[in-house]
Amino acid sequence: MNTVIQVQNILLKVIEEPPEHTAIILTARSKEIFLPTIISRVLSLGMTSVTEAESMACLQEKYPAVAPALISEAVSAGRGNIGRCVEYLEHSQFFDSVKLARGLCDAMCGGNEYDVLKTLFVADGKKTLLREGLSLFQEILRDSAAFRLGGESEKSVSCAKEGAKTLSRSLSSDQAVRLYDIVSDYIGRIDANCNISLTINSLAGQIYLSLIHI
């Protein structure tokens, strides 16, 4: 959120006279970054992260017939996001995206370029799957960098905590950040409607280059 006063004053005018059929949602770590005039014109709702125990309880209530082991698996994939946990249990695209991200992590841990390419090509022709899978893989890279720097397991955000720990043993925090940036670039290419097959081939090569330079 841009907190420059002039920008917030412009935002205030939009809030006071919003375009027709428009809902405005503002997010921030604290409402205090907004001008008092904005705060007085909006509904402020506090949000807190959901613990794994809370996720388990919610999912067990929603899916009483599902085995606890499967619910625990969904919680590990969703990492405190109950919506993601539900999508995982119902085998929506998120389930396949998690599989893709974890597969990339395993392929990197194994140091095999062919496995990287094979994992990525599962999403060939599936733009939204590839994009979401790469976004989840970025979360794994984030965890890998954090673990390398001594981060705590409880603060892990990815769908592959143990995989990120394994990756952190061979990937420095700087290398994880560089690879994160590479993946960001390729997500941008996907958004720009670049050819998916060519994008996958190029990305696999870039990941392999990062592996041989570890």
Residue ranges, per PLM feature:
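Conserved H-loop
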Residues: L26
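Conserved AAA+/SF3 P-loop NTPase catalytic/coupling segment centered on the Walker-B
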Residues: M1-L12, I33-F34
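Conserved catalytic/switch belt of AAA+ P-loop NTPases
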Residues: N9-A23
